[in-house]
Structure formats: structure tokens, C-alpha cells
């Protein structure tokens, strides 16, 4: 499955402590779109979080997620490259790609 499009919607937060940087939609093979991937700035750097939902007991469960580490790395690298391309001022972020 090839990534054919990545759309980034940067989140401009008035709260300086906000960790959410952007929402991402990734298109695969021009056939399937995965929405609501989040780019988050954590204590150990920037990472992606997959779409999830809250269960009745308050736990968050991923709706969809990569099965292999290789694909997660490919997806994360592609998203980070597009994020930096669209937001060159954010180059100081600790992006792992």
C-alpha cells in the first residue's frame, strides 16, 4: 500500500501548554483515507497518535493502527516530512525521521 497524499491541518492553540501540533489525513493508493492522526509534542519528542475512541470505562482504544514497526516508521516519517515541508518554521522540533 502506497501513501498517495498527506494533508496536514496545523492546530493553532491559544494555550501555550498544548501538545497537539496538527491533525493529519493520509490517503493510501488513492482509495482509502485515514483521518484524525494526531501529531503530538511529547516529553521525548514529537510522535504520531492514531485515531482512537473512549470506551465506557474511560480507556482510549485505537480505532486503527499499524501492525508492524516498519510500517509505523514509514507512516511517521512521511507525515513528519510533509509537516516540515508545510511548516518550515517548526524545524527545531525533535522529529525522528
From Swiss-Prot:
Entry-linked SUPFAM superfamilies: SpoVG-like (SSF160537)
Alphabetical keyword list: Cell cycle, Cell division, Septation
One Pfam assignment: SpoVG
Domain of life: Bacteria
GO biological process entries: division septum assembly; sporulation resulting in formation of a cellular spore
InterPro entries noted in UniProt: SpoVG (IPR007170), SpoVG_sf (IPR036751)
Chloroplast in keyword set: no
Keyword Lipid metabolism: no
NCBIfam families (alphabetical): PRK13259.1 (NF009749)
Role description: Could be involved in septation.
Family classification: Belongs to the SpoVG family.
Protein name: Putative septation protein SpoVG
Record organism: Borreliella afzelii (strain PKo)
Species lineage: Bacteria, Pseudomonadati, Spirochaetota, Spirochaetia, Spirochaetales
Gene: spoVG
Amino acid at each position: 500500500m502506497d501513501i498517495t497524499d498527506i494533508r496536514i491541518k496545523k492546530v493553532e492553540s491559544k494555550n501555550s501548554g498544548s501538545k497537539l501540533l496538527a491533525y493529519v489525513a493520509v490517503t493510501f493508493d488513492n482509495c482509502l483515507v485515514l483521518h484524525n492522526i494526531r501529531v503530538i509534542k511529547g516529553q521525548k519528542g514529537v510522535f504520531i497518535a492514531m485515531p482512537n475512541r473512549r470506551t465506557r470505562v474511560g480507556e482510549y482504544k485505537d480505532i486503527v493502527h499499524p501492525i508492524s514497526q516498519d510500517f509505523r516508521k514509514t507512516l511517521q516519517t512521511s507525515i513528519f516530512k510533509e509537516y516540515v515541508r508545510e511548516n518550515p518554521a517548526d524545524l527545531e522540533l525533535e522529529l525522528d525521521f
